[in-house]
């Protein structure tokens, strides 16, 4: 059993965390504003960078790792102080391997290990061959039953996976639009969007046209990103592990230990009702992937093959007598009412803003409708020996099947909730992941004592 070294990108990973140390000497330039101060700051920054790069190179040279035939990983760093860490395969809940484009060009991989029952993870920068060797030793893929989405299933996977990037891009664009910028490629891109918005403004007010065009562009960007991940996507299962891999530009692989699975989350939204299928997310330990494990049609048996014993909450609405209305409707109702008030005021003061404000109001009204759906359907049940729950978050209705045997249950009651015999129930899973169900009847919780 030979010891192996880390990839040189581990130095860059360390230097990225210390970037503030290089920027601190540049703060004096903001006050001095002269070439001498700038030269001094650059020299100090270069000196700090050189020292930290030398220390990082020494740590990289002194750091080693090895894994034996039983899947026990030992990592050591020896530079003045000896630091060792040991992790057995039986203690590992999940493992992910990420290969962004820059890493692939350098032959590197980022391996993240998620120990069972812990929030702290272990990140290793290894070569592509060593990363695959480590994954095969700790979570072997033997006699795996694999499934690759085809045709319409791959299209549904791409559409339902296009969620998070749009929100982040919208925030970034909003920040960039609020700041002055020099004419460059970014300015040219905004100029093209302005032309599209001007074309749409022939039929719509300018603000509304910009909102629609920007939303369409961001959704298309998110769709392209999700479609790139759906390329070469495969999900597989063995007797002890569950995994998936895929990606065209950014390669991603995930392996989960079946004995350490926390829950399976089936997310419903207007898009899932239109496509007739739902994305399924699986959590193990503190690993909460943003990419669905698979897209499942309710009449298909594949989910039961991957997760035997998987159960869904009942579809019938729950009894809403005494259920807390503020807990469900206030988060969306307050901004919706405020936008309605601003729309009414703008009708007489700034008519040009009326239609854009109506668009924002419509978004909050849709969130209010989703809150009503959660008010009717949110709850917790025991189905076929499995604990299942349903809760509403934004536009998504989460149908969750608990797969671990020992989630921690916390009940919180206000005086008004105690008067109607209802409680807020929080489930805490190994790794610190939490799910909250609001205003549940105490009489429907036989596994708790009230």
What do the PLM-derived regions correspond to, one by one?
Residues 1-450:
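N-terminal basic, Ser/Thr-rich segments that initiate or prime the first beta/alpha elements at protein or domain
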């Amino acid at each position: 059993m030979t010891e192996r070294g880390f990839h040189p990108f581990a130095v860059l990973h360390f230097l990225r965390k210390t970037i503030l140390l290089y920027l601190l000497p540049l703060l004096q330039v903001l006050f001095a504003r002269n070439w001498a101060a700038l030269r001094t700051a650059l020299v100090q920054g270069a000196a700090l960078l050189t020292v930290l790069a030398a220390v990082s190179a020494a740590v990289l040279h002194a750091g080693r790792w090895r894994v034996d035939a039983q899947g026990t990983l030992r990592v050591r760093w020896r530079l003045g102080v000896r630091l060792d860490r040991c992790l057995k395969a039986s203690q590992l809940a999940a493992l992910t391997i990420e290969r962004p484009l820059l890493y692939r060009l350098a032959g590197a991989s980022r391996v993240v290990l998620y120990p069972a029952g812990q929030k702290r993870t272990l990140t290793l920068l290894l070569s592509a061959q060593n990363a695959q060797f480590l994954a095969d030793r700790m979570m072997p893929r033997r006699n795996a039953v694999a499934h690759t989405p085809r045709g319409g299933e791959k299209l549904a996977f791409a559409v339902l996976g296009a969620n998070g990037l749009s929100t982040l891009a919208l925030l970034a664009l909003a920040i960039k639009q609020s700041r002055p910028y020099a004419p460059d490629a970014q300015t040219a891109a905004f100029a093209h969007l302005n032309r599209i918005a001007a074309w749409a403004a022939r039929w719509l007010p300018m603000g509304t046209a910009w909102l629609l065009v920007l939303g369409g562009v961001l959704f298309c960007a998110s769709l392209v990103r999700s479609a790139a991940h759906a390329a070469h996507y495969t999900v597989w299962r063995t007797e002890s592990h569950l995994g998936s891999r895929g990606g065209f530009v950014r390669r991603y692989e995930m392996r989960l230990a079946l004995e350490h699975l926390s829950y399976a989350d089936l997310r419903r939204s207007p898009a899932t009702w239109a496509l007739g299928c739902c994305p399924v997310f699986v959590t193990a330990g503190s690993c909460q992937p943003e990419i669905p494990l698979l897209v499942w049609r309710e009449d298909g048996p594949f989910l039961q093959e991957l997760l035997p014993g998987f159960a869904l909450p009942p579809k019938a609405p729950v009894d809403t007598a005494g259920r807390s209305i503020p807990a469900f409707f206030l988060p969306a109702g307050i901004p919706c009412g405020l936008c309605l008030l601003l729309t009414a005021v703008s009708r007489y003061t700034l008519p040009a803003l009326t239609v854009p404000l109506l668009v924002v109001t419509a978004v909050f009204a849709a969130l209010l409708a989703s809150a009503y759906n959660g008010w009717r359907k949110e709850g917790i049940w025991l189905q076929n020996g499995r604990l299942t729950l349903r809760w509403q978050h934004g536009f998504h209705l989460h149908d969750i099947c608990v797969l671990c045997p020992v989630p921690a249950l916390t009940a919180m009651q206000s005086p008004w909730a105690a008067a109607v015999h209802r409680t807020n129930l929080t489930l805490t899973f190994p790794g610190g992941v939490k799910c909250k169900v609001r205003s549940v009847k105490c009489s429907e919780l036989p596994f708790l004592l009230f």
